[in-house]
């Protein structure tokens, strides 16, 4: 193991500030070591059980590799070079990715080739990154008979337990047959034509796009977007509910949002958290986010203030692109679509009426955040957008932020301020106090590099001059007990 040792000295310290020394990252802190270096946005993401991540987006290079639209990252953010080894990926951006039960990946996007082989805009990729040619890769999506829109966009993929899946976006035909905004497919890629929530065309003056979808535990679907004319008229707009049997829930009360929906996520039982660029609802002002009850009515208890998002009263160009309830906190990301430098990544209380006192994001992105993904354990928040920095760290387009204190893998952490020696940091000096008798002191970087290895036998504080950073400190006493 490479060792970079520093001289230690013994001093008496009157008082220092407490440090959570056992945490590799503190809650709210950006993980500067997680740095894949994309040259474009991540638009969709699958979090693997082994800690790896599959990212789809509008990137053409990741690090030193020329790869378009789809890549798999290791748990530390490095590229998984075994995935699509030697391949170039798509010829254009990918908008959505989902993992099948057997470990393959469904990918949708604006592409026409994968590894230089002609494909449709929906493909299935094997676990090793190669094209699954057993899947029906020639599905044809279209937008026809519409006044202004000619080009399709596939925005969302939602898996079902039986292997079927939904695709939603900007289209109204699949293989020449009616499919307004959403279609259901069998596992082999053939369309399940029994799923047709409406037999009516999207209204010609509607903006026909689904930007957000959430599948409820009962199997029903909530769809949000810019559409203003689902089911042929203007009553079903911005946010709709599709029953588990595939029928349109026409009893779902329309909240009358004055803008578009860009994110939907669960908010406890029988409620959803909705984000977008709306400013009002039929029940009054709701700035960029609101909570909707199961029947479509507005939850009056959630009501965030405008200054949580911006100090600028000209708020028409602001939008929330991602929102999620995590414990008793609401995480929101977004910014100004006209002035990208006006961005936010905030944590509100559950009622939206104040900033959280239990979780604060330490560094703000320098440009708009357009994507949010939180792992199932609520350990990390992954964000993407137009930013190149988060706080003081250069992190182009993609970053990871800790939502709770993170302890290095393989370390059994103990809060040594309470049960043994104490470790504190102040003014460039790491001090260790409370050692009794003979002990072994080790200080490592988070990558495992030894910075200090020594035997000590002094009751006075041990002082190590170290630059500000994250360190792993281990103290093994004469009885063989180790504090980390």
Regions found by a protein language model. Name each.
Residues 6, 17, 27-28, 233, ...:
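A generic "functional-site adjacency" signal
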Residues 414-484:
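C-terminal outer-membrane/trafficking sorting elements
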Residues 6, 13-14, 102, 351, ...:
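Serine/threonine-rich, low-complexity intrinsically disordered segments
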Residues 9, 227, 258, 425-426, ...:
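Short, surface-exposed loop and linker segments with low hydrophobicity and enrichment for Pro/Ser/Thr
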Residues 13-17, 99, 157, 213-215, ...:
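A generic structural signal for short, solvent-exposed coil/turn residues
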Residues 1-25:
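Bacterial Sec-dependent N-terminal signal peptides
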Residues 21-412:
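Extracytoplasmic mature domains of secreted or surface-exposed proteins
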